[in-house]
Amino acid sequence: MYKRQEEAKAYVSEEKGVKNVAEALNGAKDIIAERISDEADYRIYIRNLTTKNGSISSTAKNAETQSVYEMYYEFEEPVRKLAGHRILALNRGEKEKFITVKVNAPEEDILRYLNKRVIKKDNPNTTPILKAVVEDSYKRLIGPAIEREIRSDLTDKAEDGAIHVFGKNLEQLLMQPPIAGKVVLGWDPAFRTGCKLAVVDATGKVLDTTVVYPTAPTTEKKIRAAKDTVEGMIEKYGVSLISVGNGTACRESEQVIVDMLKEIPEKKVQYVITNEAGASVYSASKLATEEFPNFDVGQRSAASIARRVQDPLAELVKIDPKSIGVGQYQHCLLYTSDAA
């Protein structure tokens, strides 16, 4: 140690900001640590090893806080097995400050590898120092950089996969065959605020709208009134198909419709459950306001649900793709013009 200190004195310089021997020695250690960190072969090996044998874990910032990320409050999975949707969920939970996410590397194996590469010959005077420098280089420089690279790579792959799924699902949704030549009753289901109805003719023109209350909280009287109202619209406008949105109160509405149709078998009216994702977004949009200036959002939504079965493509192109709800975390992704 005395010899090292003597040699280090030559590097002490007030002008260069090296005030004493300790600073000179620490500076030398930092230089070695940076050189180790800059070795591309080391980084490649460590990244591959971490990807193969490492894991990603997450913990709650506050375990008492309720959120949609509770399954990630105490979570760990190997890097190589982590599914894309989990990566996106972890990223979002971290961004919203519910969880802390980290990459757990096989640190002992990594340090053993680095020591073998850096320390060419065992020397009782230098080996302990070099081991400390290697550990510092990994923990302070290499490790954090590798963690960022791995998480960035996983995120890129997860987003690419999510966009592919989104595009495929959206194409299938948009290319559904239209049901032409039918007068359709659009049914936007709900509980407390009532179910909004809209009848559109074969060209998509809205003929009538109303609200019925057959779902909870309700009474037999309200259910009967709802059935009578719908039967009256079927009779008046020649409705042959009822398009029911698949949102809240869908099943309850479906049961009411099934019971009602049993009462009028001669009308041969059918019903279909329709994906209503994005209908509420559209109904509050500027485009919907211009298209239906005298309707409220519920009436616009019901009209949209009816039109979706008549011509899915023409109706769905009015909605921001991120609001259609056919992918994984699509609201978190940045889309290029051809993503869908």
Give the label of every model feature segment.
Residues 1-5, 335-339:
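Conserved small/polar residues in nucleotide/adenosyl-binding loops
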Residues 3-186, 190-295, 302, 306:
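Duplex nucleic acid-engaging cores and interfaces of nucleic-acid transaction enzymes
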